[in-house]
């Protein structure tokens, strides 16, 4: 076998590598789904609060849980695109993004359909869906900056305030968090 492919690996070594990649892939999907669910809880909590500051604070607990648990959230990874850790792993970003989007939307959609809690976010979603491309881009860049500050700040300081404050800023400024936006769309019952 090794001679056929011009390498010195044994079949058992190749199978171990393949199995390790399969495990890594399944962990990526699981961590991405859990991250989407945690952000979904943040969305639900945020729009359930009458006080926007309290809602923004409680939303930050979703990202805090994602970071503490080491889950895979697209918006926490994309800021590191130029780093060696992420370079060449575009497929992980794409898979993570889709798993985040599907899980946050599904949780919020099901919550809106089966919960007795009345959630009003149609105005928020309508505003986001009707904003111009330049507005959306500026708001997305603002969110990306806040997410990078949160994730990178926590990795360097281990201080929860470095997560909480940037998240509160992006929520209170109305920045566009692509994963959270899907949660809000799900809460409105949109497909």
Predicted regions and their residues:
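Cationic, low-complexity basic patches in intrinsically disordered or flexible, solvent-exposed regions
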Residues: 11
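Ala/Thr-enriched low-complexity intrinsically disordered regions
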Residues: 2-3
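Alpha-helical transmembrane segments and their helix-helix packing motifs
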Residues: 18-191
